[in-house]
């Protein structure tokens, strides 16, 4: 299972656009530094089943080639300093999903 990709799924609600913009501008250099890849985002995700959590209005998905890369990104002290802007500006859930080999 080593070197399996890791996917990050973010659900968030932006409460302070100016503060979040500071975070957003600094996010991509850290993603690149830790070998991450932006996949997509959606400001109006469609809930096909169940109840859409009303507190969130944006979904973001990005990935890393390994769990170690994801952990290095998360634990980077400079990234954590930047993420203070995100924490101040949003309500958020962030999930780390480990890639798995398809079952046969």
State the predicted function of each range:
Residues 71-73, 78-91:
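C-terminal structural segments of small proteins and small subunits
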Residues 93-97:
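Short, electropositive alpha-helical surface patch
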């Amino acid at each position: 299972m080593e070197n399996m990709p890791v996917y990050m799924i973010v659900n968030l609600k932006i409460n302070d656009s100016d503060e979040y913009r500071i975070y957003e501008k600094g996010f991509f250099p850290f993603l690149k530094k830790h070998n991450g890849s932006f996949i997509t985002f959606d400001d109006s995700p469609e809930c096909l089943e169940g109840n859409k959590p009303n507190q969130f209005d944006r979904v973001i998905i990005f990935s890393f080639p390994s769990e170690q890369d994801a952990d290095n990104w998360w634990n980077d002290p400079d990234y954590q300093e930047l993420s203070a802007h995100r924490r101040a500006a949003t309500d958020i859930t962030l999930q780390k999903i480990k890639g798995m080999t398809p079952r046969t």
